[in-house]
Amino acid sequence: MIDRYKHQQLRIGSVSPQQITAWANKILPNGEIVGEVTKPYTFHYKTNKPEKDGLFCERIFGPIKSGICACGNYRVIGDEKEDPKFCEQCGVEFVDSRIRRYQMGYIKLACPVTHVWYLKRLPSYIANLLDKPLKELEGLVYCDVYPNFSFARPIAKKPTFLRLRGSFEYEIQSWKYSIPLFFTTQGFDTFRNREISTGAGAIREQLADPDLRTITDHSLVEWKELGEKGSTGNEWEDRKIGRRKDFLVRRLELAKNLIRTNVEPEWMVLRLLPVLPPELRPIIQIDGGKPMSSDINELYRRVIYRNNTLTDPLTTSRSTPGESVMCQEKLVQEAVDTLLDNGIRGQPMKDGHNKVYKSFSDVIEGKEGRFRETLLGKRVDYSGRSVIVVGPSLSLHRCGLPREIAIELFQTFVIRGLIRQHVASNIGIAKSKIREKEPIVWEILQEVMQGHPVLLNRAPTLHRLGIQAFQPILVEGRAICLHPLVRKGFNADFDGDQMAVHVPLSLEAQAEACLLMFSHMNLLSPTIGDPISVPTQDMLIGLYVLTIGNRRGICANRYNPCNCRNDNDQNETVDDNNYKYTKEKEPYFCSSYDALGAYRQKRIHLDSPLWLRWRLDQRVIASREVPIEVQYESSGTHHEIYGHYLIVRSVKKEILCIYIRTTVGHISFYREIEEAIQGFCRAYSYGT
C-alpha cells in the first residue's frame, strides 16, 4: 500500500524505460517476471475472470479480492507465517486488492513511437531540440511521403554497405525513383535495421546523439552573433533574425530545463508504453448486467492489436515488404497518439455510436479532469464555499464572512470558548446554544475570529495569488464580501463567481498565512513585478465621478469669495462654521471638515465647485501663470484670481492666504489617500 506520509508531493515529467519496468515488473517465486501486457483481452465471457496477460490480469495488477488468488485460494494478508506469498498455480500475489489502484503494467512496443505531446503540442519540444521543421518531422514519423528518408541516418558510427555517413536528402533526383523500388523488396526490414533508422527510431537516434550542454552552448553563441549584427536595413530580414533569436531562446530554456530535471531527450520517444492501473480505467456492470468500460481500455486494446500485428512479421522469418512494415508502424504510432491525446492530429476517433473516445489527455485536463475535480476539487474539513460580492467598505486585508459559514467553520473554537467561560458544561450543551444562536455565541465567535486568519481560494489556482489570507469579519447575508482590489490576483469577477474559504488549524499554517499570504503583502505580480492590486472597472468609474467636478471653469461661473459684503442679500447665509455659502455663487471654506460637513447637511453637492483655504504652499502657485482678475479692497489688500486658485495679498504684496478651487469629491479622495499613506508609514515604522 502507498504510505501517505512517505509521498508528500507529486511531480509530472518524462521517465526512462528502466523506471517504467521498475514500476511494473514483479518477480514470482519461480523466477518468472510479470508486468508486460501482451494480450488485448479484458474478462473471459464465460467465467467473468480477468484474462491472463491481459489488461486486467491479476498476476500483473494484483487480486480483485483481497487475499484471494485467481484459483480461489485464500491467505491472510500481512501474516509472516503464511508462505508462500504467491499462488504456485496462477502466480497471483496474496495482497490487498487496493494494489490495483496503483500497480502499473507496460506494453513493449515493436517499434519506437514518438510521444505526441512533445511532437505536436506547440511549441514542439522535439522540433526545437533538433532544430528541424515540424512538417519534416511529421512526414518522417507518419510516413506521409513514402519513403521519407530525409532524416535517416546510419545506426553504426562507421560506414555501412550503402556508405551512409550521415543523413541524406530524399529530394535528390537520383534517389527519387530508385529508393521506393529498393525498399519494397523482400528482406528489406532486415537490411534496413542493419543499415539505417527511419521514422521515430531516426528521431530517437538524433535526440540521443547531441549533448544538452553542447546545444545550450551553440544556441547561446548563435544568439550572441545575431545580436551583434544589428539591423540589416531590410524589414523582412530583421523579422527573420528576430524569429530566429526567439527560437534560440526557447531552445536554450528547454535544454536548461531538461538538464535541471535530469531528463534525457530520447525519452520523448517511447519504447515502453505504461498501462494505467485497472481501478483507474474500470469495467462495471450497469442495470441488466450490461458491462460498461472506460474508453481508455478500448484505446489500449487498439494499441495492443496493432502492436502484435507488427511484432509477428518482425519476429518470424517471413519476408514482408518494407512498405507494409512502415504502414503498420504508422498504425501503431496513430494508435498511441489516440490513446494519449485523441484528436490532436485532426479528426478524433469515434466508437460505433459516433461518440468521441476520451483519451488520457481528456481524462486529466479541464475543469472535470482528474486533477481539478478529483484531487484539487474534493471537499475537505474546515472549509466552505459561497458566491463573492463587493465589499467596498472593507480593508484590503479583510473579508466579510457570512454568519452561517463562520459558525460552522469555527464551531470547535466556539465550543471551547463556551466551556472555558463556564457558559456550557459539556459539548452537547454548547452545541445546543449554538443551534439556538444565543448572543453569547456571536460574542465568542467575534473573539475567535479576531486573531484567526482564513484562506480564500478560487479555482483554478494557477499561481500563488490564487489563494490568499484575510482577516474575517461577520457580515449579514450568505455571500462572501471581498475588497475589489484583490479581484485581479484571483482572476475573479463579481458576476456569480464562487470562492472557497479554508481555516488554517496548526500554528505553523496560521503563522505562514499572517506573514506571507495576507492580501496587503501581495500587491505585486510574482512573475513580472507589476502592481496587481490596481483599480479597474467600477472603481475607475467611481473615481471618475468622484473627481469630475464642474468643468465649466471660473470664467464661466465667476466668483470672488471676498466680494460678499451685503448682509441683507437674501441669497447669502453666514453661520458659525467659518464658511460662507451663496446659492448662486461658489462658497468658500476654511477647512476640509467644514466642506464635508456642508455636504453631509446637503448644502452643497458632490461635484459643486468651492473655494477651500489651503496652507501656504508655493507648489500650488504656477510661476508663469497670469491672474485672470485682480480685485482691490479699501484696506489695501488685493485678491489675485487664477484658474484653479486664489491668492490674498497684503499691502506689501505678502501672501496672507491661499484658496484652491476644488470639489467635495476631490477633498474626500485626497483625504482617503492621505490617511492610507500615513497608516502605511506608521505600520512601516512600527515594523522596523
UniProtKB/Swiss-Prot annotation:
Q: Where in the cell is it found?
A: Plastid, Chloroplast
State the reactions this protein catalyses: RNA(n) + a ribonucleoside 5'-triphosphate = RNA(n+1) + diphosphate
Name its GO BP terms in alphabetical order.
DNA-templated transcription
Its top-level enzyme class, in one word, is: transferase
Task: Determine the domain of life of the protein's source.
Answer: Eukaryota
Sequence positions that bind Mg(2+): D493, D495, D497
Identify the cofactor(s). Answer: Mg(2+); Zn(2+)
One cellular component term (GO) for this entry is: chloroplast
| Keyword field | Chloroplast, DNA-directed RNA polymerase, Magnesium, Metal-binding, Nucleotidyltransferase, Plastid, Transcription, Transferase, Zinc
Which residues participate in Zn(2+) binding?
C69, C71, C87, C90
- The answer, when asked if Nucleus is one of the entry's keywords, is no
What InterPro entries does its record include? DNA-dir_RpoC_beta_prime (IPR045867), RNA_pol_asu (IPR000722), RNA_pol_N (IPR006592), RNA_pol_Rpb1_1 (IPR007080), RNA_pol_Rpb1_3_sf (IPR042102), RNA_pol_Rpb1_clamp_domain (IPR044893), RNApol_RpoC1 (IPR034678)
HAMAP family according to UniProt: RNApol_bact_RpoC1
Role summary? DNA-dependent RNA polymerase catalyzes the transcription of DNA into RNA using the four ribonucleoside triphosphates as substrates.
Summarize subunit and interaction data from the UniProt record for this chain: In plastids the minimal PEP RNA polymerase catalytic core is composed of four subunits: alpha, beta, beta', and beta''. When a (nuclear-encoded) sigma factor is associated with the core the holoenzyme is formed, which can initiate transcription.
Would you tell me the protein name for this molecule? Answer: DNA-directed RNA polymerase subunit beta'
Its source organism is Chloranthus spicatus
Its lineage opens with: Eukaryota, Viridiplantae, Streptophyta, Embryophyta, Tracheophyta
